[in-house]
């Protein structure tokens, strides 16, 4: 396939147009008075959202050079979302500001490599300064504030705070769609372990790349399953029941894995295979935990059991199982309550007896998985469109609160980035390196400027006043008042702010040091130039 090339200024300007198109669509959503963006969805109702990464993912531009620029900013949003789970709009605004300012300097003759060095130096100082002003999240109320700010909804903040209170900061919290109008929180018994599906073809939701199984049977074994014939008699019994099955084994490979995937794709039955969690003796113990939770019998040589002789009554079951590429969550297992209580007591006794810190930690993990719960936030709304938008906001808010617990909080609304302005300004540098530092300095005020403009105000005036305000004092765009952001509960997780700045700077530096761009020339559409009629198969 033929390629087209652009060099230096032509290349960068073409990509900049793409950066601006994507960033301009995303940045209208930032702040309490940010707007929504409507995304066209084939075959279903349009999606209305203010989630930066969701908007960024939808944008595909016709011009290949513009599209490459847009994809770079998409990468900023994706990486920030991956690391911190929120802050994607802030990251996009920062990236656009750095790229625009940097490009002006490159066009004026600055050396891009020197600019990159200055950008890197400034970001290192900025990140350290953010950590220096960061405050720990101390209580349930502060967790609720973080969630409320992220979702722009106090009620959502309370639900997330309650969920984290019930299952712990590292507990499993899932978000589901409710059939009613109200959003509810419920905690159900569940277990999560860090093993995902063995093939992506096992997913039931290709958009989210997850497998959701309702009322599945659960096979628990420490054996390696290589031959499909070994599990065929058991699967035939499962097929007759019209229920899905989760297979937890040492490994599913060879023709066993191939046939499971083929039958899943044909719709014969739904089966998801995951590797058993843990290693060695710990793996055996965790499989026994899972078996007790779900009412299964572990198919193991220790009990003299063979897979080909296994019957359906040896399988466990659960109300729901969710499997991602990295994790499996079993919700509401059908195990006997007395057996579960006895197992919990046994693990507690082992924790008391052990002298090893490592063993104690692993036993406590097992106890949490067995005795702990899964908190489910059931999202309600008046329409499907509102439901999807609300669900996205809650997912962002949950990620934000977890990030806040991990690294603390700073003043929100972009205030913290302006508060660290002086620290970055103190960096001693010369020439193009100093120019690189100035690129970051100018970008630090971009989120506040955009939040003010989305509120219908003059961004430059707000930024100038903020630079001279006391630390922590910022502009509340929701009420148009100057307040102490931390006291008012207008906060951002340090991790979110830090990640947004780091990823924006990384992509901006790559953009500025780009000297050539290679794009694929689209092939002409044959329908535009229909050939002469002829016999089938003839040229």
UniProtKB/Swiss-Prot annotation:
Superkingdom of origin: Bacteria
Keyword Metal-binding included in the entry's annotation: no
Gene Ontology cellular component list: cytoplasm
One Gene Ontology molecular-function label: unfolded protein binding
Family recorded in the similarity comment: Belongs to the chaperonin (HSP60) family.
Record note on quaternary structure: Forms a cylinder of 14 subunits composed of two heptameric rings stacked back-to-back. Interacts with the co-chaperonin GroES.
Protein name: Chaperonin GroEL
């Amino acid at each position: 396939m033929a390629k087209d090339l652009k060099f230096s200024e032509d290349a960068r300007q073409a990509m900049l147009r793409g950066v601006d198109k994507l960033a301009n669509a995303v940045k209208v959503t930032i702040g309490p008075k940010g707007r929504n963006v409507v995304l066209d969805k084939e075959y279903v109702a349009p999606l209305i959202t203010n989630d930066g990464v969701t908007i960024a993912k939808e944008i595909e531009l016709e011009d290949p050079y513009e599209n490459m620029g847009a994809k770079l900013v998409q990468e900023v949003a994706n990486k920030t979302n991956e690391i911190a789970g929120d802050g994607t709009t802030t990251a996009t605004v920062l990236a656009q500001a750095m790229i625009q300012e940097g490009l002006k300097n490159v066009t004026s003759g600055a050396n891009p490599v020197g600019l990159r060095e200055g950008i890197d130096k400034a970001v290192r100082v900025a990140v350290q300064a953010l950590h220096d002003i960061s405050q720990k999240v101390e209580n349930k109320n502060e967790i609720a504030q973080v969630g409320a700010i992220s979702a722009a909804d106090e009620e959502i903040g309370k639900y997330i705070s309650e969920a984290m209170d019930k299952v712990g900061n590292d507990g499993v919290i899932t978000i589901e769609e409710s059939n009613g109008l109200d959003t509810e929180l419920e905690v159900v018994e569940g277990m999560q372990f860090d093993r995902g599906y063995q093939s992506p073809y096992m997913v039931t939701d290709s958009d989210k790349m997850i497998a959701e199984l309702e009322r599945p049977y659960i096979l628990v074994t420490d054996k390696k399953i290589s031959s499909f014939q070994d599990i065929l008699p058991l699967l035939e019994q499962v097929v007759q029941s019209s229920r899905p099955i989760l297979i937890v084994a040492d490994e599913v490979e060879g023709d066993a894995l191939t046939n499971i995937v083929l039958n899943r794709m044909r719709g014969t039955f739904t089966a998801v295979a995951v590797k058993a969690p843990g290693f060695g003796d710990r793996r055996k113990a965790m499989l026994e935990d899972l078996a007790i939770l779900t009412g299964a019998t572990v198919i193991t040589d220790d009990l003299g059991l063979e897979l080909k002789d296994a019957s359906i009554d040896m399988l466990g079951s659960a109300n729901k199982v969710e499997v991602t590429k990295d994790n499996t969550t079993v919700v509401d297992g059908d195990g006997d309550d007395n057996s579960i209580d006895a197992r919990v007591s046994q693990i507690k006794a082992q924790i008391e007896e052990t002298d090893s810190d490592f063993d104690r930690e692993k036993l406590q993990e097992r106890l949490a998985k067995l005795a702990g719960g899964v908190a489910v936030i059931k999202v309600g709304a008046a329409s499907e469109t509102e439901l999807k938008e609300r669900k996205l906001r809650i997912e962002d808010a949950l990620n934000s609160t977890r990030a806040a617990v991990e690294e603390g909080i700073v003043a929100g609304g972009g205030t913290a980035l302006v508060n660290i302005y002086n620290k970055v300004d103190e960096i001693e540098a010369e020439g193009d390196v100093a120019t690189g530092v100035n690129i970051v300095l100018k970008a630090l005020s971009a989120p506040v400027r955009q939040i003010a403009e989305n509120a219908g105000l003059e961004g430059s005036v707000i930024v100038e006043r903020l630079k001279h305000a006391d630390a922590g004092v910022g502009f509340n765009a929701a009420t148009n008042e100057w307040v102490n952001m931390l006291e008012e509960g207008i906060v951002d997780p340090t991790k979110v702010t830090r990640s947004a700045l780091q990823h924006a700077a990384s992509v901006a530096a790559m953009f500025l040091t780009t000297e050539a761009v290679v794009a694929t020339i689209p092939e002409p559409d044959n329908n535009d130039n229909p050939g002469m009629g002829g016999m089938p198969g003839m040229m």
